[in-house]
Amino acid sequence: MHKFAIEVSSLIKNFGRTKAVDNISFNVELGSITALLGGNGAGKTTIISMLMGLLVPTSGSIRILGNDIAKNRYSILPQVNFSSPYVDLPNRLTVEENLNVYANLYSIEDVKSQICSLSESLNIKNLLKRKTGHLSAGQKTRVALAKALINDPQLLFLDEPTASLDPDTADWVRGYLKDYALDKGATILLASHHMGEVERLSDFVFMLQAGKIVDEGAPKTLIKKYGRSNMEEVFLDVARGRRSKDMKEN
């Protein structure tokens, strides 16, 4: 049994002369909720795209659930999924039709039961007969999450999971994701620049800047390490080039 859901070694991704991901290595423990935290251009989405096999690394290795994805990518597909509010769902299909399409891709045995269960737990049952193109941004975010959970994934990738949601709904979604990870023993890797979300949701954080991991740790550990009161203050310190050792010296 492998200890880590994700194992990354010496990962590099270049786009022409631009180094989007600069020689990073990290592991994500099974059953954890781990965040990639960084501003725009930090490399979060590029990293997740490589982990999912959507982008080929310039160099380095990636193992997902014990499998080297360069050699065995397709064997992991039934066990993983992805959600992002920035990925469009077919507007001409109803929510139910969209979920049916994705359920069939994963060969779900009891599609009707799975859709019913997800729609109830994510509060989208009243949206099932509506066309996706007629939904609000927040409603689309919840539907995208239902799509990502259709196969009960053991590894879930999330890109800004609560974008476009009002504060109450966003907080509810975070609680839902925590319960999902706990109940299913699933691993979640999320990319975010929402400091409060990372602080409340994550067990562990990798802080990114210009394609590099500049610090890592549990949110409470990082807050204590930097002598700050929350992750937003920690993030600002890192963004401004200050490190924990600098603050101890000052």
Feature-to-residue mapping (PLM):
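ABC ATPase "signature
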Residues: 216-217
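Catalytic Walker B motif of ABC-type/P-loop ATPase nucleotide-binding domains
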Residues: 156-160
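Conserved ABC ATPase "signature" region
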Residues: 100, 104-127
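Conserved ABC ATPase signature
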Residues: 131-135
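Helical segment within the ABC ATPase nucleotide-binding domain
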Residues: 171-183
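Conserved catalytic motifs of ABC-family nucleotide-binding domains
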Residues: 152
